Amino acid sequence: MSGAFEIVMDERKTLVDKIISMMKQGYFFNKEEWDRASLGPQNPLSKVQYKGGNRLRLMAMVVEHGYTDPRWATARQYSQKGYYIKKGEHGVLCEKWIFEKQKKVKDENGRETFETVQLDRPQVSFFRVFNAEQVQDFPSFSGNEYKEPDLDQLIDRIISTSECPIHEIAQERAFYSPSEDVITLPLRSQFKDQTSFAKTLLHEMSHSTGAANRLNRRFSGPFGSEGYAKEELRAEIGALFTETDLGIHLAGEHYEDHSDYLRSWIGVIQNDYNEFFRACADAEKISDRLIGNYTKKYELPMLMAAEDIPDRNSQEKQTAEPERTEASL
């Protein structure tokens, strides 16, 4: 029987093969199918959002299966509320990595206390989650009464939170210059629509987080090199995560033709499928920084499922118990 590590690695390869298939079809996160995943995957019972590779994995499953509900939870979590998985449905594996542990030590006074120590080798486990549409009679998704943001206002706000200057100029390229720490974009009128401008803006802002005084990623290699492709992949996924947190639809198009990028990404992750998950981890850091800067000045739109899920177990218990009357006391 395979252990947790082998199972997780097998599932990683399966996902990356699917992503590569999408790339070979000529798209990655900018087709209408991906717009289903504009609301990031969230757990309605624990009230948390899935992060990193788990976030991307569940977004990909929304696209693959055509789900319109962004909510995911384990079978046990559903059953604790009295809901059960439909017959024949299969869950999606999510990973949990542990990099540190609490070690019992004694302080200078001889009293026992705990300190955090790094593990020599990370420990991995996994769990499986199911989309709410796979659950019998689960309350339908309300959409959180979410309204699409005013993109003109949102774009201006995003730009105002940038850690480096952003220049909009009548020219043909969108790029971040590490040496000058400046982002240059074409004019907004040169884009297909505002969503496409926002998507390109966040991609370049994602690159800017790699500066030495920020997240300190290496900008290595010319266009077409492996180092260049790795950084582009991180910026693309980082922008994707940020778009979902800001409520921006994912169906926008980049200003430039990304077919060359797609080919370079295929080469990187085909040779090492774990590189895709390393990119997702870095992308989460990118998004956390961009969103952190944004929330210093503005509030995020309400994207988490705010409604409380009815507990059917307690409802059934109340129904089963006879009403207590004065005569029965």
Model-derived regions: residue spans:
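N-terminal accessory/interface modules of nucleic-acid-binding and processing proteins
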Residues: 1-328
